[in-house]
């Protein structure tokens, strides 16, 4: 124990305002005071090219009622959050364990959130007004009227490999297995 309360994760390519960490801390505290078991709080990623939020409806559980948490931001409970800029209490790692390093680059944050929920009942949240500029992959391409984030071949390899590894774990949600199975299959053949 080094005397720290939280670990702040930040990607090198995410752009945050000065107040993002304060918002994460404030909202974590409000969730805790409402007796909600918190695993992680994260930011709402905004696509730097389009200015639109990255939203995955199948990942979102519910918007937390403002009556439950007074003096907070809009908070969305999710099955998992991106670690691009996120905050996790140090003591939670003693309960859940660390990130699965064998996954290396893709799915690491998702797997940790799913494990925290399944094994420990710890929940993950997005603080909606804690926005960051972010870019998934190297840009977007359309595939049958749907935008698909394009990744380098190196990254696609790890996405597909990690998808296969994660499909074997019983705590990984079925919706994620179905959705990403199709997506990664298409990426293998359609995108360079």
Give the residues covered by each predicted segment.
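Short beta-strand-to-loop element that shapes/binds the nucleotide-sugar donor at the catalytic cleft/hinge
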Residues: 41-53
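Short glycine/serine/threonine-enriched helix-capping/active-site loop
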Residues: 38-44, 127, 135
């Amino acid at each position: 124990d080094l005397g720290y309360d939280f670990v702040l994760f930040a990607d090198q390519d995410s752009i945050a305002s000065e107040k993002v960490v304060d918002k994460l801390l404030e909202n974590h505290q409000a969730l805790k005071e409402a007796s909600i078991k918190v695993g992680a709080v994260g930011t709402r990623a905004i696509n730097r090219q389009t200015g639109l939020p990255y939203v995955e409806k199948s990942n979102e559980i519910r918007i937390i009622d403002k009556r439950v948490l007074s003096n907070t931001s809009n908070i969305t409970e999710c099955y998992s959050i991106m670690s691009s800029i996120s905050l996790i209490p140090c003591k939670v790692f003693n309960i859940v364990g660390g990130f699965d390093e064998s996954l290396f680059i893709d799915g690491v944050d998702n797997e940790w959130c799913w494990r925290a929920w399944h094994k420990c009942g710890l929940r993950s949240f997005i603080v909606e007004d804690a926005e960051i500029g972010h870019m998934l992959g190297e840009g977007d391409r359309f595939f049958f009227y749907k935008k698909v984030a394009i990744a380098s071949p190196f990254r696609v390899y790890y996405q597909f490999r990690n998808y296969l590894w994660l499909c074997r774990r019983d705590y990984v949600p079925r919706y994620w297995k179905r959705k990403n199975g199709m997506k990664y299959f298409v990426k293998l053949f359609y995108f360079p």
